[in-house]
């Protein structure tokens, strides 16, 4: 039997997304992490389009990290994402959608790495 209760992570995700959509008209940088992989994508919610994405599943990352999600893998994903965002042009400012994840560990490491590359989050 499926429970009607909403889990803590789902409540956190809804709360974060509601604040982002209410306060911003900027593009949204959304992340997803699992035990083995880390994914990031830049989304325009107005037209429902993904402009750029990167993950630890890409060959450049797998060759270096041996399929483990750690700070080194996240730094490489941030580098890939910054290269793709620079190709888009004037995409330097966006909102950071951390989803149900707390802003610690590799989530904060990824955000700080993007800030180091000159993006405003």
UniProtKB/Swiss-Prot annotation:
Pfam family, one: Ribosomal_L18p
Stretches assigned to coiled coil: none
Classification via Gene3D superfamilies: 3.30.420.100
InterPro entries documented for this protein: Ribosomal_uL18_bac-type, Ribosomal_uL18_bac/euk
Keyword line: Ribonucleoprotein, Ribosomal protein, RNA-binding, rRNA-binding
GO biological process: translation
Keyword Glycoprotein appears in the UniProt entry: no
Subunit structure: Part of the 50S ribosomal subunit; part of the 5S rRNA/L5/L18/L25 subcomplex. Contacts the 5S and 23S rRNAs.
PANTHER family: 39S RIBOSOMAL PROTEIN L18, MITOCHONDRIAL, LARGE RIBOSOMAL SUBUNIT PROTEIN UL18M
Function: This is one of the proteins that bind and probably mediate the attachment of the 5S RNA into the large ribosomal subunit, where it forms part of the central protuberance.
NCBIfam families assigned to the protein according to its UniProt record, in alphabetical order: L18_bact (TIGR00060)
Similarity annotation: Belongs to the universal ribosomal protein uL18 family.
UniProt name for this protein: Large ribosomal subunit protein uL18
């Amino acid at each position: 039997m499926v429970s009607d209760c909403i889990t803590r992570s789902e409540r956190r995700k809804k709360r974060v997304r509601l604040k982002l959509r209410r306060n911003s008209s900027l593009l949204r940088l959304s992340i997803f992490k699992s035990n083995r992989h880390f994914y990031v994508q830049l989304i325009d919610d107005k037209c429902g389009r993904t402009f750029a994405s990167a993950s630890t599943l890409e060959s450049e990352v797998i060759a270096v990290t041996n399929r483990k999600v750690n700070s080194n893998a996240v730094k490489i994903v941030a580098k890939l994402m910054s290269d793709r965002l620079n190709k888009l042009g004037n995409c330097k400012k966006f909102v950071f959608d951390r989803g149900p994840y707390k802003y610690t560990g590799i989530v904060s490491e990824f955000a700080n790495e993007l800030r180091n590359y000159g993006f405003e989050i």
